[in-house]
Amino acid sequence: VAMEYSPMGNIPYISRVDAGTIEIVRECGVEIVSSGDLVNSFEARWTEEQRRDNFEVAKIMRGAVDSAFAFVKENVLSHNRITEYDVQQYMVQVMKRAGINAGGPNVSVDANTANPHYGPRKEGSAEVKEGSFVLIDFVARADKPNAVYSDFTWVGYVGASVPEKYVKTWNIVKGARDAAVEFMRTSFAEGKTIHGYEVDDVARKYITDRGYGDYFLHRTGHNIGREGHGNGVHMDDFESHDDRRLLPASGFTVEPGLYFETFGVRTEVN
């Protein structure tokens, strides 16, 4: 019997049946196996309509991010004081005008970019000014019941020349991202089965080989569905060991990052 159970709790997202129920079923002489791949198959595959809507929203999101960076540039050059929260709310309005409810993007600068779960508040947000390193993590979906999310992260620098520490870190993070994506493309082309943890291993090895493994503080990616973090396979051999298979027509992020005391760099693609 396949149940929402994961041996040794390897994948806690799908391990939802309590231990007592497992014991009762086993006492009936029934073998229990994980329903992980079934959940992945039924919940993670996108329809063609979902894929089209996702791509359209992604284009709108890219336009909103470009507009946000232009908003920052205009205000900084005009010596107008703006904060992370101001940029966030500007983006929310841009998306509303496009008919998309995007919630509140994570707009962070400098030391706040080192917190992967940061979210600006109206009171106490940091100022965005010349010399700021900016990170924008942005989630949105079409206004339809079955629409799936798009989820991206961009980084930028407010100034004419980007300091070397940001360039160096960006190149490492980008290299890890591209290595993970290329691993998947090559494996699919060769007809190989890919498991979520393998994608994480590729990105993590790339970063570790360059001496920064201790600063990569989260999994490489997560499933995307009607929830921002869906129930399908995650690119994870760090927070959990996700041994589920990547399936055609499913969506997920690839988002390695490096986080230091004074700044963090993450790139996120779908």
Residue positions per predicted region:
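Active-site neighborhoods and metal-handling regions in enzymes and metal-associated proteins
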Residues: 1-270
